[in-house]
Amino acid sequence: MSPVYVNLLGSVGLLAFWYFSYRWIQRKRLEDPLPPWLRKKKACALTRRSRHRLRRQHGVIDGENSETERSVDLVAALLAEAGEESVTEDTEREDTEEEREDEEEENEARTPEVNPIDAEGLSGLAREACEALKKALRRHRFLWQRRQRARMLQHNGPQQSHHAAVFCRVHGLRGFQVSVWLLLTLLWSTGHGVSVRCTYHGTDVNRTSNTTSMNCHLNCTRNHTQIYNGPCLGTEARLPLNVTFNQSRRKWHSVMLKFGFQYHLEGWFPLRVLNESREINVTEVHGEVACFRNDTNVTVGQLTLNFTGHSYVLRAIAHTSPFESYVRWEETNVTDNATSSENTTTVMSTLTKYAESDYIFLQDMCPRFLKRTVKLTRNKTKHNVTVTGNNMTTLPVWTPECKGWTYWTTLSVMWRNRRSALLRAKSRALGHWALLSICTVAAGSIALLSLFCILLIGLRRDLLEDFRYICRDEGSSSTKNDVHRIV
């Protein structure tokens, strides 16, 4: 499994553990924290004290019927015979403390302290804040609707005001749903099925010892809407295809894309193949540069080249890692002719030489090209025109001294270095994700420790009360054991 998914699952598991731990602690806070045997004993003691308090309030306390007083008198008599008068004082002190605790319980019952954090934890506080916000929004909406009805009644009369109020209520109920539906529809209509295709046709191919030239005509459409029709030469200058900002940190990127458009749209690409395959006898060239979104809404770029019945296709999928895809040109319309097979081998070797650069260029260019052509189709009067001019595209034999060759070499080296950087980054990815995992675990541990400390601080009063009760119960049980031992 990929380290990305491992860390994602670990983070989700840590959040789930934190959430369920918090819920368990909140549930335990609402329960009695004492064990069952101590809880039963405490309930009995509270029952006796409550009964004693009620009898004292109604004035029906009888010394003969009071089990507590009778037991205290018996213990006092036994200890008096043994000469232990201090026990009587301790018993009286315990009675005084019980009466004081009863008074405190009565005061707390009269003025209960309501704290949402002590009662239900952070969920209670959040619930109260949410209820207060709902009340404020409901109040604001009611006042706004009343002002709207008053304004409509003042300007249009009672009947039209009734219709306007009904419309406002319907709009308030369904406006958000309609807005979301329209937004999703707009995104789907603008993002699904978009295609931009630029096809070129080269005729009168003429090759000399120093240059290769041809008459080239280009036609570009977006969803069957024409955005350019004219000679290949000067296409990049006539179409505002500045798909990147010409900033200092992106200057090399802008240069690469600019030369890439010139290379593929102005006919340099087939001329380079013809220059490096001079033994092929070709008189006509067809080609296409296409960018489209497939049925799964994934951007795909495609280069097509056709030499006298032989077609070569290169496809690139955007937003994918170059090292995870197999880059190669595919050949179609294969014949069994020996001469044709030899020519095909020569062309394939020439195309394979820079296939990686063409692939990465399509990955980078197609998403930007699709977004850029949206503006071209909106302004039809300015850019949807037929351009006339010189159709002749000439390219010298590509030697290291040629400017185009220098650009293309720099472009290929940059893309090759970019691919190497991605490969090196992939080898270091595991170390980065391991560091992220350690930081995630440490942050989760700190969060759990903080939660425990916060809950401990919030429960300090209950814990101290439980400890005092346990200590008092242990002290009374030791006194009873001493009495039984004396008896």
UniProtKB/Swiss-Prot annotation:
Keyword Iron found: no
UniProt-annotated site: Cleavage site, residues: G193, V194
Alphabetical UniProt keywords: Glycoprotein, Host endoplasmic reticulum, Host Golgi apparatus, Host membrane, Host mitochondrion, Host-virus interaction, Membrane, Modulation of host cell apoptosis by virus, Signal, Transmembrane, Transmembrane helix
Regions that span the bilayer: 433-459
Gene Ontology biological process terms from the UniProt entry: symbiont-mediated perturbation of host apoptosis
GO CC annotations, alphabetized: host cell endoplasmic reticulum membrane; host cell Golgi membrane; host cell mitochondrial membrane; host cell peroxisome; membrane
Signal peptide per UniProt: 1-22
Acidic residues composition bias: residue spans: 83-107
Chain positions carrying an annotated carbohydrate: 206, 210, 219, 223, 242, 246, 275, 281, 294, 297, 306, 333, 337, 343, 379, 384, 391
Disordered: annotated segments: 83-121
Keyword set includes Ion transport: no
Family, as annotated: Belongs to the immediate early glycoprotein family.
Name the record gives this protein: UL37 immediate early glycoprotein
Protein encoded by which gene: UL37
